[in-house]
Amino acid sequence: MATYSNQHWLLSHIRNSFISTDDTGMCETVMLSDDMPKHYLRKFGNSGAGGDHYHWRRAHKTPPTGGGTTPERNTRHPDAPLQEVDFICYPGLDLSDDEEDMSTHSFDIQMYPEVGAHRFRSNTAQKLEKLDIAKRRAARIKSVNYQEEVQPPESDDFFKRKELPLSKAERVKNEPKANDDDLSDEGVQSQLTEQLAKSPKQAQNRFIEFARFDGTSQVGMQTKRINVFLNMLPEPDRNYPLKICVVATAKIQEVIGFVCYRTSLQYPDVPLKSLQHYALYMTEDNDDMEDFPPLDNREPCSKFGFSQLTLAERRPLAPVTRVDYHSQLGSKSMTSVEDKTALSDAAVKALQNISLNGGTSDPGGGGGGGDSPHDNVKEYEKRLLNHNDMLEAPMHRTFRLNIIDKRFFKSDVTLGISGERIEIDQCKNAKFWPQKKPVSTPIDFVAHCEILERRHLKALLRIWLKSNSSSPSFSTGCTSAPINASVTTLNAGSGSGGIAHSPSSPGHSSGLFSSSNIRFKHYDFDTDTHTAEQIHNKLNCILEMRSSDLRREFLLQRDRKQEKRQLKL
Protein backbone atom coordinates (compact mmCIF):
# COMPACT_ATOMS: atom_id res chain seq x y z
CA MET A 1 0.00 0.00 0.00
CA ALA A 2 3.01 2.29 0.24
CA THR A 3 3.12 2.53 -3.57
CA TYR A 4 -0.25 4.22 -3.67
CA SER A 5 -0.11 7.99 -3.69
CA ASN A 6 -3.82 8.59 -3.53
CA GLN A 7 -4.35 9.57 0.09
CA HIS A 8 -8.13 9.54 -0.18
CA TRP A 9 -8.11 6.00 -1.52
CA LEU A 10 -5.82 4.83 1.29
CA LEU A 11 -8.00 6.42 3.96
CA SER A 12 -11.14 4.89 2.46
CA HIS A 13 -9.53 1.47 2.25
CA ILE A 14 -8.31 1.60 5.86
CA ARG A 15 -11.66 2.85 7.07
CA ASN A 16 -13.64 0.12 5.30
CA SER A 17 -11.18 -2.59 6.35
CA PHE A 18 -11.51 -1.69 10.01
CA ILE A 19 -15.29 -1.53 9.81
CA SER A 20 -15.65 -4.87 8.02
CA THR A 21 -13.31 -6.81 10.31
CA ASP A 22 -14.38 -5.39 13.66
CA ASP A 23 -17.03 -7.64 15.31
CA THR A 24 -17.63 -5.32 18.24
CA GLY A 25 -18.81 -2.36 16.16
CA MET A 26 -16.74 0.17 18.11
CA CYS A 27 -14.50 0.95 15.14
CA GLU A 28 -17.48 1.81 12.95
CA THR A 29 -18.88 4.08 15.65
CA VAL A 30 -15.62 6.01 15.91
CA MET A 31 -14.87 6.27 12.21
CA LEU A 32 -18.39 7.24 11.20
CA SER A 33 -18.45 10.15 13.67
CA ASP A 34 -17.98 13.78 12.77
CA ASP A 35 -14.92 14.92 10.91
CA MET A 36 -12.49 15.87 13.67
CA PRO A 37 -10.09 17.90 11.48
CA LYS A 38 -12.90 20.23 10.45
CA HIS A 39 -13.93 20.77 14.06
CA TYR A 40 -10.30 21.41 14.97
CA LEU A 41 -10.00 23.90 12.14
CA ARG A 42 -13.14 25.80 13.13
CA LYS A 43 -12.02 26.01 16.77
CA PHE A 44 -8.42 27.07 16.24
CA GLY A 45 -8.68 28.58 12.77
CA ASN A 46 -7.71 32.13 13.75
CA SER A 47 -5.69 31.52 16.93
CA GLY A 48 -2.60 30.13 15.29
CA ALA A 49 -2.00 27.69 18.11
CA GLY A 50 -1.84 24.51 16.03
CA GLY A 51 0.86 22.43 17.62
CA ASP A 52 1.40 20.06 14.72
CA HIS A 53 1.37 22.83 12.18
CA TYR A 54 3.88 24.78 14.30
CA HIS A 55 6.34 21.92 14.36
CA TRP A 56 5.85 21.43 10.63
CA ARG A 57 6.60 25.13 10.06
CA ARG A 58 9.80 24.99 12.13
CA ALA A 59 10.99 21.90 10.31
CA HIS A 60 10.44 23.53 6.89
CA LYS A 61 11.31 27.15 7.65
CA THR A 62 13.29 29.08 4.98
CA PRO A 63 16.82 30.30 5.64
CA PRO A 64 17.36 34.06 6.15
CA THR A 65 17.87 36.16 2.99
CA GLY A 66 19.68 39.07 4.52
CA GLY A 67 23.41 39.49 3.93
CA GLY A 68 24.28 40.80 7.35
CA THR A 69 27.05 39.20 9.33
CA THR A 70 25.05 39.12 12.53
CA PRO A 71 22.42 36.30 12.61
CA GLU A 72 19.00 36.97 13.86
CA ARG A 73 18.70 36.17 17.54
CA ASN A 74 15.47 35.52 19.41
CA THR A 75 13.46 36.67 16.45
CA ARG A 76 9.84 35.38 16.59
CA HIS A 77 8.07 34.95 13.32
CA PRO A 78 4.32 34.84 13.46
CA ASP A 79 2.76 31.52 12.45
CA ALA A 80 0.68 31.38 9.35
CA PRO A 81 -3.01 30.78 9.91
CA LEU A 82 -4.23 27.17 9.70
CA GLN A 83 -5.74 26.13 6.43
CA GLU A 84 -8.05 23.26 5.55
CA VAL A 85 -5.45 21.96 3.17
CA ASP A 86 -3.13 21.11 6.10
CA PHE A 87 -5.49 18.35 7.35
CA ILE A 88 -6.28 15.13 5.52
CA CYS A 89 -9.95 14.40 6.05
CA TYR A 90 -11.92 11.24 5.59
CA PRO A 91 -13.34 11.23 2.10
CA GLY A 92 -17.00 10.98 1.44
CA LEU A 93 -18.24 12.59 4.68
CA ASP A 94 -19.79 15.51 2.84
CA LEU A 95 -21.31 13.34 0.13
CA SER A 96 -24.78 11.90 0.03
CA ASP A 97 -25.70 8.44 1.36
CA ASP A 98 -26.98 7.25 -1.97
CA GLU A 99 -26.31 3.56 -2.48
CA GLU A 100 -25.49 4.15 -6.13
CA ASP A 101 -22.58 6.34 -5.20
CA MET A 102 -19.67 3.87 -5.47
CA SER A 103 -17.12 6.34 -4.11
CA THR A 104 -18.42 5.88 -0.55
CA HIS A 105 -17.66 2.17 -0.47
CA SER A 106 -14.48 0.17 -0.51
CA PHE A 107 -13.22 -1.06 -3.82
CA ASP A 108 -12.51 -4.55 -2.47
CA ILE A 109 -15.85 -5.21 -0.71
CA GLN A 110 -18.81 -6.34 -2.73
CA MET A 111 -22.17 -5.16 -1.47
CA TYR A 112 -24.09 -8.16 -2.75
CA PRO A 113 -23.15 -11.53 -1.22
CA GLU A 114 -24.42 -13.43 -4.27
CA VAL A 115 -21.66 -12.08 -6.44
CA GLY A 116 -18.23 -13.15 -5.21
CA ALA A 117 -18.95 -12.41 -1.57
CA HIS A 118 -16.70 -13.76 1.17
CA ARG A 119 -18.37 -14.61 4.49
CA PHE A 120 -16.25 -14.63 7.61
CA ARG A 121 -16.37 -17.88 9.56
CA SER A 122 -17.75 -17.97 13.04
CA ASN A 123 -15.90 -19.15 16.11
CA THR A 124 -17.76 -22.46 16.03
CA ALA A 125 -16.53 -23.25 12.53
CA GLN A 126 -12.98 -22.42 13.53
CA LYS A 127 -13.19 -24.66 16.57
CA LEU A 128 -14.63 -27.50 14.50
CA GLU A 129 -11.79 -27.15 12.02
CA LYS A 130 -9.25 -27.26 14.84
CA LEU A 131 -10.89 -30.37 16.26
CA ASP A 132 -10.81 -31.99 12.81
CA ILE A 133 -7.13 -31.21 12.46
CA ALA A 134 -6.46 -32.59 15.95
CA LYS A 135 -8.32 -35.81 15.10
CA ARG A 136 -6.30 -36.22 11.92
CA ARG A 137 -3.09 -35.81 13.86
CA ALA A 138 -4.28 -38.23 16.53
CA ALA A 139 -5.12 -40.81 13.87
CA ARG A 140 -1.50 -40.77 12.74
CA ILE A 141 -0.23 -41.25 16.28
CA LYS A 142 0.22 -44.77 17.59
CA SER A 143 0.23 -45.37 21.35
CA VAL A 144 2.53 -48.03 22.66
CA ASN A 145 2.39 -49.14 26.29
CA TYR A 146 5.86 -49.47 27.57
CA GLN A 147 6.23 -52.08 30.24
CA GLU A 148 9.54 -52.51 31.82
CA GLU A 149 10.37 -56.07 32.64
CA VAL A 150 11.38 -56.15 36.28
CA GLN A 151 13.72 -58.88 37.16
CA PRO A 152 12.76 -60.37 40.53
CA PRO A 153 15.62 -60.44 42.97
CA GLU A 154 17.04 -63.73 43.90
CA SER A 155 15.66 -65.07 47.13
CA ASP A 156 19.01 -66.50 48.12
CA ASP A 157 20.29 -62.99 48.84
CA PHE A 158 17.49 -62.27 51.32
CA PHE A 159 17.00 -65.62 52.99
CA LYS A 160 20.41 -66.87 53.83
CA ARG A 161 20.60 -69.79 56.11
CA LYS A 162 22.12 -68.89 59.41
CA GLU A 163 24.20 -71.43 61.18
CA LEU A 164 23.09 -71.70 64.80
CA PRO A 165 24.96 -73.54 67.49
CA LEU A 166 23.43 -76.79 68.53
CA SER A 167 21.35 -76.66 71.68
CA LYS A 168 21.75 -79.01 74.56
CA ALA A 169 18.73 -81.07 73.57
CA GLU A 170 20.00 -81.51 70.00
CA ARG A 171 23.45 -82.46 71.24
CA VAL A 172 21.93 -85.09 73.46
CA LYS A 173 19.83 -86.32 70.55
CA ASN A 174 22.77 -86.50 68.13
CA GLU A 175 25.05 -88.32 70.55
CA PRO A 176 25.33 -92.03 69.75
CA LYS A 177 23.63 -94.19 72.30
CA ALA A 178 25.59 -96.85 74.05
CA ASN A 179 22.74 -99.32 73.97
CA ASP A 180 20.47 -99.75 70.95
CA ASP A 181 17.51 -100.51 73.18
CA ASP A 182 17.79 -97.17 74.94
CA LEU A 183 15.30 -95.13 72.87
CA SER A 184 13.92 -92.90 75.60
CA ASP A 185 14.25 -89.08 75.26
CA GLU A 186 13.40 -88.09 78.78
CA GLY A 187 14.20 -84.51 79.68
CA VAL A 188 13.93 -83.19 76.07
CA GLN A 189 11.18 -80.57 75.53
CA SER A 190 10.54 -78.15 72.71
CA GLN A 191 10.36 -74.40 73.18
CA LEU A 192 6.65 -74.37 72.38
CA THR A 193 5.99 -76.89 75.14
CA GLU A 194 7.97 -74.81 77.60
CA GLN A 195 6.12 -71.60 76.66
CA LEU A 196 2.74 -73.28 76.94
CA ALA A 197 3.68 -74.64 80.35
CA LYS A 198 4.75 -71.21 81.58
CA SER A 199 1.82 -69.24 80.14
CA PRO A 200 -1.39 -69.09 82.21
CA LYS A 201 -4.49 -70.82 80.99
CA GLN A 202 -6.69 -68.38 79.11
CA ALA A 203 -10.30 -69.44 78.81
CA GLN A 204 -12.63 -68.15 76.12
CA ASN A 205 -14.79 -65.26 77.26
CA ARG A 206 -18.40 -66.43 77.16
CA PHE A 207 -19.67 -62.88 76.63
CA ILE A 208 -17.50 -62.28 73.54
CA GLU A 209 -20.55 -62.35 71.24
CA PHE A 210 -21.83 -59.09 72.76
CA ALA A 211 -18.65 -57.19 71.85
CA ARG A 212 -20.20 -56.26 68.50
CA PHE A 213 -22.51 -53.79 70.26
CA ASP A 214 -19.58 -51.57 71.24
CA GLY A 215 -20.43 -48.06 70.06
CA THR A 216 -16.88 -46.70 70.16
CA SER A 217 -15.89 -48.70 67.06
CA GLN A 218 -18.97 -47.81 64.98
CA VAL A 219 -18.94 -45.12 62.30
CA GLY A 220 -22.12 -43.49 61.04
CA MET A 221 -24.41 -45.15 63.60
CA GLN A 222 -26.28 -43.67 66.53
CA THR A 223 -24.81 -44.56 69.91
CA LYS A 224 -25.81 -44.11 73.54
CA ARG A 225 -23.56 -43.56 76.55
CA ILE A 226 -24.63 -45.06 79.88
CA ASN A 227 -23.00 -45.12 83.32
CA VAL A 228 -23.66 -48.54 84.83
CA PHE A 229 -23.12 -49.26 88.53
CA LEU A 230 -22.13 -52.88 89.15
CA ASN A 231 -23.79 -54.26 92.24
CA MET A 232 -21.70 -57.44 92.31
CA LEU A 233 -18.39 -55.60 92.83
CA PRO A 234 -16.84 -55.02 96.25
CA GLU A 235 -17.67 -51.87 98.16
CA PRO A 236 -14.77 -49.61 96.97
CA ASP A 237 -15.33 -50.38 93.27
CA ARG A 238 -19.10 -50.36 93.47
CA ASN A 239 -19.36 -46.60 93.96
CA TYR A 240 -17.72 -45.78 90.61
CA PRO A 241 -19.80 -46.55 87.49
CA LEU A 242 -18.65 -48.42 84.43
CA LYS A 243 -18.88 -46.06 81.46
CA ILE A 244 -20.02 -47.81 78.30
CA CYS A 245 -21.02 -46.74 74.80
CA VAL A 246 -23.40 -49.03 72.92
CA VAL A 247 -25.25 -48.75 69.62
CA ALA A 248 -28.71 -47.24 69.92
CA THR A 249 -30.40 -50.27 68.35
CA ALA A 250 -29.14 -52.71 70.99
CA LYS A 251 -31.79 -54.22 73.22
CA ILE A 252 -31.61 -54.25 77.01
CA GLN A 253 -30.67 -57.95 77.00
CA GLU A 254 -27.77 -57.19 74.66
CA VAL A 255 -26.71 -54.21 76.78
CA ILE A 256 -26.56 -56.51 79.82
CA GLY A 257 -24.37 -58.92 77.85
CA PHE A 258 -22.05 -56.09 76.80
CA VAL A 259 -21.79 -54.85 80.40
CA CYS A 260 -20.87 -58.38 81.50
CA TYR A 261 -18.27 -58.51 78.73
CA ARG A 262 -16.68 -55.24 79.86
CA THR A 263 -16.83 -56.36 83.48
CA SER A 264 -15.03 -59.62 82.67
CA LEU A 265 -12.24 -57.63 81.00
CA GLN A 266 -11.90 -54.94 83.65
CA TYR A 267 -12.55 -57.16 86.70
CA PRO A 268 -11.46 -60.69 85.73
CA ASP A 269 -11.55 -61.92 89.33
CA VAL A 270 -15.27 -61.20 89.78
CA PRO A 271 -17.38 -64.31 89.06
CA LEU A 272 -20.30 -63.66 86.73
CA LYS A 273 -23.46 -65.67 86.26
CA SER A 274 -25.61 -66.07 83.17
CA LEU A 275 -27.56 -63.20 81.65
CA GLN A 276 -30.85 -64.48 83.07
CA HIS A 277 -29.64 -63.63 86.59
CA TYR A 278 -29.05 -59.92 85.91
CA ALA A 279 -31.28 -56.98 85.12
CA LEU A 280 -30.90 -53.23 84.67
CA TYR A 281 -32.61 -51.10 87.32
CA MET A 282 -33.18 -47.37 87.45
CA THR A 283 -30.85 -45.69 89.90
CA GLU A 284 -30.14 -42.32 91.42
CA ASP A 285 -26.93 -40.32 91.40
CA ASN A 286 -25.77 -41.83 94.70
CA ASP A 287 -26.01 -45.45 93.44
CA ASP A 288 -29.29 -46.20 95.20
CA MET A 289 -31.61 -48.46 93.24
CA GLU A 290 -35.20 -47.32 93.04
CA ASP A 291 -38.11 -49.58 93.88
CA PHE A 292 -39.20 -50.01 90.28
CA PRO A 293 -39.28 -53.12 88.12
CA PRO A 294 -36.28 -53.70 85.84
CA LEU A 295 -36.15 -52.54 82.26
CA ASP A 296 -37.76 -54.81 79.70
CA ASN A 297 -35.14 -56.97 78.00
CA ARG A 298 -36.90 -56.81 74.65
CA GLU A 299 -36.95 -53.01 74.36
CA PRO A 300 -34.11 -51.06 72.68
CA CYS A 301 -31.89 -48.99 74.93
CA SER A 302 -32.65 -45.83 72.92
CA LYS A 303 -36.23 -45.95 74.19
CA PHE A 304 -35.13 -45.10 77.74
CA GLY A 305 -33.55 -41.75 78.51
CA PHE A 306 -31.67 -42.85 81.65
CA SER A 307 -27.99 -41.99 81.74
CA GLN A 308 -27.30 -44.01 84.92
CA LEU A 309 -28.41 -47.57 85.58
CA THR A 310 -27.50 -50.35 87.98
CA LEU A 311 -26.73 -53.92 86.98
CA ALA A 312 -27.84 -56.25 89.75
CA GLU A 313 -29.30 -59.68 90.21
CA ARG A 314 -32.99 -60.01 89.61
CA ARG A 315 -35.10 -59.52 92.68
CA PRO A 316 -37.09 -62.58 93.80
CA LEU A 317 -40.63 -62.60 92.50
CA ALA A 318 -43.38 -63.48 94.92
CA PRO A 319 -45.59 -66.34 93.69
CA VAL A 320 -49.06 -65.41 92.58
CA THR A 321 -51.78 -66.79 94.84
CA ARG A 322 -55.07 -67.51 93.15
CA VAL A 323 -58.30 -68.51 94.81
CA ASP A 324 -60.86 -70.21 92.56
CA TYR A 325 -64.53 -70.18 93.48
CA HIS A 326 -66.25 -73.22 92.03
CA SER A 327 -69.74 -71.89 91.92
CA GLN A 328 -72.26 -71.08 89.28
CA LEU A 329 -72.28 -67.38 90.09
CA GLY A 330 -70.19 -65.15 87.91
CA SER A 331 -68.98 -63.03 90.85
CA LYS A 332 -69.09 -63.28 94.62
CA SER A 333 -68.82 -60.67 97.31
CA MET A 334 -65.80 -60.74 99.64
CA THR A 335 -67.68 -59.44 102.66
CA SER A 336 -68.07 -62.83 104.34
CA VAL A 337 -65.67 -63.77 107.12
CA GLU A 338 -64.99 -67.24 105.67
CA ASP A 339 -63.76 -65.83 102.37
CA LYS A 340 -61.49 -63.31 104.06
CA THR A 341 -60.04 -66.03 106.30
CA ALA A 342 -59.37 -68.36 103.36
CA LEU A 343 -57.69 -65.59 101.40
CA SER A 344 -55.48 -64.53 104.32
CA ASP A 345 -54.43 -68.13 105.00
CA ALA A 346 -53.44 -68.57 101.37
CA ALA A 347 -51.39 -65.37 101.43
CA VAL A 348 -49.59 -66.34 104.66
CA LYS A 349 -48.81 -69.78 103.25
CA ALA A 350 -47.38 -68.27 100.08
CA LEU A 351 -45.17 -65.89 102.07
CA GLN A 352 -43.89 -68.71 104.26
CA ASN A 353 -42.80 -70.68 101.21
CA ILE A 354 -40.54 -67.86 100.04
CA SER A 355 -36.92 -68.28 101.11
CA LEU A 356 -34.25 -65.64 101.20
CA ASN A 357 -32.48 -66.85 98.05
CA GLY A 358 -35.56 -66.52 95.90
CA GLY A 359 -36.52 -70.21 96.02
CA THR A 360 -39.27 -72.03 97.94
CA SER A 361 -38.71 -73.82 101.22
CA ASP A 362 -39.51 -77.47 101.67
CA PRO A 363 -42.67 -77.69 103.78
CA GLY A 364 -41.86 -81.31 104.71
CA GLY A 365 -38.64 -80.33 106.42
CA GLY A 366 -36.47 -82.27 103.98
CA GLY A 367 -33.09 -80.71 103.46
CA GLY A 368 -32.28 -79.46 100.02
CA GLY A 369 -28.56 -79.92 100.46
CA GLY A 370 -28.52 -82.78 98.00
CA ASP A 371 -29.19 -80.42 95.06
CA SER A 372 -26.12 -78.85 93.51
CA PRO A 373 -25.89 -75.07 93.00
CA HIS A 374 -25.93 -75.64 89.24
CA ASP A 375 -29.31 -77.35 89.49
CA ASN A 376 -30.65 -74.50 91.59
CA VAL A 377 -29.46 -72.00 88.99
CA LYS A 378 -31.20 -73.90 86.19
CA GLU A 379 -34.40 -74.14 88.21
CA TYR A 380 -34.28 -70.42 88.96
CA GLU A 381 -33.74 -69.57 85.29
CA LYS A 382 -36.63 -71.82 84.32
CA ARG A 383 -38.92 -70.10 86.82
CA LEU A 384 -37.89 -66.70 85.45
CA LEU A 385 -38.66 -67.75 81.89
CA ASN A 386 -41.99 -69.25 82.91
CA HIS A 387 -42.89 -66.05 84.73
CA ASN A 388 -42.06 -63.96 81.65
CA ASP A 389 -44.15 -66.26 79.48
CA MET A 390 -47.07 -65.94 81.88
CA LEU A 391 -46.85 -62.15 81.75
CA GLU A 392 -46.62 -62.02 77.94
CA ALA A 393 -49.19 -64.71 77.17
CA PRO A 394 -52.40 -62.62 77.63
CA MET A 395 -51.08 -59.86 75.36
CA HIS A 396 -52.57 -59.78 71.88
CA ARG A 397 -50.26 -60.94 69.12
CA THR A 398 -50.78 -61.89 65.48
CA PHE A 399 -49.05 -64.56 63.41
CA ARG A 400 -48.95 -65.09 59.64
CA LEU A 401 -49.31 -68.76 58.63
CA ASN A 402 -51.18 -71.16 56.30
CA ILE A 403 -54.37 -73.04 57.18
CA ILE A 404 -55.03 -76.50 55.70
CA ASP A 405 -58.56 -77.55 54.80
CA LYS A 406 -59.90 -81.06 54.24
CA ARG A 407 -58.83 -81.00 50.58
CA PHE A 408 -55.28 -80.23 51.71
CA PHE A 409 -55.40 -76.77 50.12
CA LYS A 410 -53.44 -74.05 51.90
CA SER A 411 -54.64 -70.50 52.41
CA ASP A 412 -52.77 -67.57 53.94
CA VAL A 413 -54.42 -66.49 57.19
CA THR A 414 -53.63 -64.23 60.12
CA LEU A 415 -53.97 -65.88 63.52
CA GLY A 416 -54.55 -63.49 66.43
CA ILE A 417 -54.17 -64.79 69.99
CA SER A 418 -54.98 -62.90 73.18
CA GLY A 419 -56.17 -63.69 76.67
CA GLU A 420 -59.80 -63.31 75.61
CA ARG A 421 -60.14 -64.98 72.21
CA ILE A 422 -58.45 -66.28 69.08
CA GLU A 423 -59.19 -64.85 65.64
CA ILE A 424 -58.59 -66.35 62.20
CA ASP A 425 -58.75 -63.93 59.28
CA GLN A 426 -57.94 -64.94 55.73
CA CYS A 427 -55.53 -62.70 53.85
CA LYS A 428 -56.54 -61.19 50.55
CA ASN A 429 -55.34 -63.15 47.54
CA ALA A 430 -55.96 -63.16 43.82
CA LYS A 431 -56.78 -66.86 43.52
CA PHE A 432 -60.00 -68.25 42.10
CA TRP A 433 -61.59 -69.52 45.32
CA PRO A 434 -63.81 -67.08 47.20
CA GLN A 435 -62.88 -65.09 50.27
CA LYS A 436 -63.89 -66.73 53.56
CA LYS A 437 -65.34 -64.91 56.51
CA PRO A 438 -63.18 -64.36 59.59
CA VAL A 439 -63.62 -66.54 62.66
CA SER A 440 -63.54 -65.27 66.25
CA THR A 441 -63.67 -67.86 69.04
CA PRO A 442 -63.59 -67.11 72.79
CA ILE A 443 -60.64 -68.55 74.65
CA ASP A 444 -63.02 -70.58 76.83
CA PHE A 445 -63.88 -72.73 73.79
CA VAL A 446 -60.20 -73.59 73.09
CA ALA A 447 -59.18 -76.97 74.50
CA HIS A 448 -55.62 -77.69 73.47
CA CYS A 449 -52.77 -76.80 71.09
CA GLU A 450 -50.18 -79.28 69.87
CA ILE A 451 -47.47 -79.69 67.24
CA LEU A 452 -48.19 -82.76 65.13
CA GLU A 453 -45.13 -82.92 62.95
CA ARG A 454 -41.72 -81.28 62.79
CA ARG A 455 -39.82 -81.20 59.54
CA HIS A 456 -36.59 -79.48 58.56
CA LEU A 457 -37.88 -75.91 58.67
CA LYS A 458 -41.64 -76.45 58.79
CA ALA A 459 -44.05 -77.68 61.43
CA LEU A 460 -47.70 -78.77 61.49
CA LEU A 461 -49.72 -77.10 64.24
CA ARG A 462 -53.18 -78.17 65.44
CA ILE A 463 -55.60 -76.22 67.64
CA TRP A 464 -58.54 -78.08 69.23
CA LEU A 465 -61.77 -76.14 69.80
CA LYS A 466 -65.23 -76.85 71.10
CA SER A 467 -67.63 -77.46 68.24
CA ASN A 468 -70.74 -75.29 67.99
CA SER A 469 -74.07 -76.30 66.51
CA SER A 470 -73.52 -73.92 63.61
CA SER A 471 -70.21 -74.51 61.93
CA PRO A 472 -68.27 -71.35 60.95
CA SER A 473 -66.78 -70.44 57.61
CA PHE A 474 -63.50 -72.23 58.20
CA SER A 475 -65.26 -75.46 59.24
CA THR A 476 -64.29 -77.00 55.95
CA GLY A 477 -61.07 -78.03 57.60
CA CYS A 478 -62.86 -80.56 59.85
CA THR A 479 -65.80 -82.90 59.61
CA SER A 480 -68.83 -83.14 61.86
CA ALA A 481 -69.09 -86.90 62.41
CA PRO A 482 -69.22 -88.30 65.97
CA ILE A 483 -66.09 -89.91 67.23
CA ASN A 484 -65.43 -93.61 67.08
CA ALA A 485 -62.38 -95.79 66.85
CA SER A 486 -62.65 -96.19 63.11
CA VAL A 487 -63.11 -92.53 62.25
CA THR A 488 -60.51 -90.62 64.24
CA THR A 489 -57.29 -91.29 66.02
CA LEU A 490 -56.00 -88.70 68.49
CA ASN A 491 -52.22 -88.36 68.33
CA ALA A 492 -51.43 -88.07 71.99
CA GLY A 493 -48.06 -86.85 73.05
CA SER A 494 -47.21 -85.18 69.75
CA GLY A 495 -47.02 -81.78 71.41
CA SER A 496 -43.95 -82.85 73.35
CA GLY A 497 -41.82 -83.01 70.24
CA GLY A 498 -42.48 -86.59 69.17
CA ILE A 499 -42.98 -87.73 65.57
CA ALA A 500 -46.58 -87.42 64.48
CA HIS A 501 -48.48 -88.26 61.33
CA SER A 502 -48.81 -85.85 58.46
CA PRO A 503 -52.22 -84.90 57.03
CA SER A 504 -51.69 -87.27 54.11
CA SER A 505 -50.82 -90.27 56.29
CA PRO A 506 -53.43 -92.84 57.39
CA GLY A 507 -52.97 -91.96 61.05
CA HIS A 508 -53.99 -88.33 60.60
CA SER A 509 -57.15 -87.28 62.43
CA SER A 510 -59.71 -85.88 60.04
CA GLY A 511 -62.80 -85.95 62.24
CA LEU A 512 -64.10 -84.50 65.47
CA PHE A 513 -63.28 -85.64 68.95
CA SER A 514 -66.29 -85.93 71.27
CA SER A 515 -67.11 -87.07 74.74
CA SER A 516 -70.56 -87.60 76.22
CA ASN A 517 -72.06 -84.20 75.33
CA ILE A 518 -68.97 -82.22 74.15
CA ARG A 519 -67.82 -82.25 70.56
CA PHE A 520 -64.38 -81.00 69.49
CA LYS A 521 -63.01 -79.88 66.17
CA HIS A 522 -59.56 -78.77 65.10
CA TYR A 523 -57.74 -76.40 62.74
CA ASP A 524 -54.46 -77.45 61.11
CA PHE A 525 -51.83 -74.83 60.30
CA ASP A 526 -48.57 -75.06 58.36
CA THR A 527 -45.80 -72.65 59.35
CA ASP A 528 -42.14 -72.54 60.27
CA THR A 529 -40.82 -74.24 63.39
CA HIS A 530 -40.08 -71.06 65.34
CA THR A 531 -43.56 -69.60 64.80
CA ALA A 532 -45.20 -72.92 65.66
CA GLU A 533 -43.31 -73.10 68.96
CA GLN A 534 -44.29 -69.52 69.83
CA ILE A 535 -47.98 -70.21 69.17
CA HIS A 536 -47.81 -73.52 71.06
CA ASN A 537 -46.18 -71.97 74.14
CA LYS A 538 -48.38 -68.87 74.17
CA LEU A 539 -51.70 -70.68 73.75
CA ASN A 540 -50.93 -73.49 76.20
CA CYS A 541 -49.72 -70.97 78.78
CA ILE A 542 -53.05 -69.12 78.53
CA LEU A 543 -54.99 -72.38 78.82
CA GLU A 544 -52.96 -73.53 81.83
CA MET A 545 -53.54 -70.26 83.67
CA ARG A 546 -57.29 -70.39 83.04
CA SER A 547 -57.63 -74.13 83.83
CA SER A 548 -61.10 -74.53 82.31
CA ASP A 549 -63.31 -77.61 82.60
CA LEU A 550 -63.27 -77.96 78.83
CA ARG A 551 -59.50 -78.42 78.77
CA ARG A 552 -59.53 -80.89 81.64
CA GLU A 553 -62.21 -82.95 79.91
CA PHE A 554 -60.25 -82.95 76.66
CA LEU A 555 -57.00 -84.05 78.32
CA LEU A 556 -58.83 -86.75 80.26
CA GLN A 557 -60.41 -88.22 77.14
CA ARG A 558 -57.10 -88.07 75.30
CA ASP A 559 -55.34 -89.99 78.07
CA ARG A 560 -58.04 -92.63 77.97
CA LYS A 561 -57.62 -93.06 74.24
CA GLN A 562 -53.88 -93.40 74.67
CA GLU A 563 -54.28 -96.07 77.35
CA LYS A 564 -56.67 -98.05 75.16
CA ARG A 565 -54.23 -97.88 72.28
CA GLN A 566 -51.39 -99.13 74.46
CA LEU A 567 -53.52 -102.02 75.72
CA LYS A 568 -54.29 -103.10 72.17
CA LEU A 569 -50.62 -103.18 71.36
Swiss-Prot record:
Domain SIN1-type PH: 395-545
Region annotation (Disordered) ranges: 52-82, 169-200, 355-377
Basic and acidic residues biased stretches: 169-180
Source species, domain of life: Eukaryota
The UniProt record lists the keyword Phosphoprotein: yes
InterPro entries per record: CRIM_dom (IPR031567), PH-like_dom_sf (IPR011993), Sin1/Avo1 (IPR008828), Sin1_N (IPR032679), Sin1_PH_dom (IPR031313)
Family named by the database record: Belongs to the SIN1 family.
Record-linked PANTHER family: TARGET OF RAPAMYCIN COMPLEX 2 SUBUNIT MAPKAP1 (PTHR13335:SF1)
Name of the molecule in the record: Stress-activated map kinase-interacting protein 1
Native source organism of the sequence: Drosophila melanogaster (Fruit fly)
